[in-house]
């Protein structure tokens, strides 16, 4: 499939009044994590936090796959970014408690809640949009790909150009999903869905890090993933503050009207495009984001 990036929307139901019209902001995520009680919330007590994490069999299987991969690479220190509810990180710690695990988020309320409920790990405030990588053997980007636009991600990979990364994708866009997203856009035009970032095709993912990293596609249990290795070999790690000179690739974007299937074909024929889309978690088997 060609390089395609589409805007993603999510219907939070009654929680939309708490989240607002755009999820991809630290204050919106904080409200969703600490002011709601649904699947996205971080439980307020340690007991509830553990109970919630242990109940996620899907995440447990994914964590085992990631743990095995980390062990195969001898990773003693792992930094996981934008962890949110941190169910995956709880499983990673349970599976390998001697491995140092640093978890980060850019919502201050989320960070505070994690400090209170997940004392076994190191919790740090970190904003991927501007901060340098932390000191770690491997840097884990687990289901945070929807959070940033293409140009923002290219800037992230430029700052992380000297470090190895494991990218575990929220979802990889294929033609079937693209058609479904665009059809749903018409049906939900008048609904109050919240902007929830972007979803991408495999080619669009790989274009983000091509200037800075080589990549190898792998499968982490239920999700498509990539192992990224720095192109710059034998130079100072970017976690030590070295500046970079990589030039981000330009981002091209096209807006569509209420889309028909013919629109999709037109966009695909034109090559790398960003198009508008709308999805809902309870229709058509669409992906529900992990908390």
What do the predicted segments below correspond to?
Residues 1-76, 81-120, 125-132, 151, ...:
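Class I (Rossmann-like) S-adenosyl-L-methionine-dependent methyltransferase catalytic domain
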């Amino acid at each position: 499939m060609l390089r395609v990036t589409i805007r993603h929307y999510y219907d939070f139901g009654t929680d939309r009044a708490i989240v607002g019209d755009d999820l991809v902001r630290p204050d919106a995520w904080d409200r969703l994590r600490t002011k709601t009680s649904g699947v996205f919330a971080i439980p307020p007590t340690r007991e509830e936090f553990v109970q919630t994490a242990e109940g996620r069999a899907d995440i447990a299987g994914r964590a085992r796959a990631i743990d095995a991969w980390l062990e195969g690479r001898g990773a003693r220190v792992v930094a996981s970014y934008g962890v949110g509810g941190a169910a995956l990180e709880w499983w990673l710690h349970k599976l390998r408690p001697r491995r140092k695990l640093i978890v980060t988020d850019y919502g201050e309320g989320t960070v505070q809640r994690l400090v209170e409920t997940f004392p076994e790990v190191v919790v740090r405030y970190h904003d991927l949009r501007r901060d340098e990588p932390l000191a770690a053997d491997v840097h884990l980007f687990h289901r945070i790909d929807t959070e940033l636009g293409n140009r923002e991600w290219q800037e992230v990979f430029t700052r992380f150009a000297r470090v190895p990364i494991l990218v575990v994708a929220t979802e990889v866009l294929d033609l079937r999903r693209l058609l479904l997203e665009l059809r749903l856009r018409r049906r939900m035009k008048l609904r109050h869905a919240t902007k929830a970032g972007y979803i991408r095709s495999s080619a669009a993912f790989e274009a983000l890090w091509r200037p800075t990293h080589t990549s190898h596609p792998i499968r982490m249990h239920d999700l498509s993933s990539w192992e990224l290795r720095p192109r710059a070999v034998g130079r100072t790690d970017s976690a030590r503050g070295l500046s970079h000179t990589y030039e981000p690739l330009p981002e091209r974007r096209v807006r569509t009207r209420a889309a028909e299937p013919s629109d999709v074909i037109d966009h695909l024929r034109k090559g790398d495009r960003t198009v508008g889309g709308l999805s809902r978690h309870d229709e058509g088997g669409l992906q529900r984001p992990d908390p």
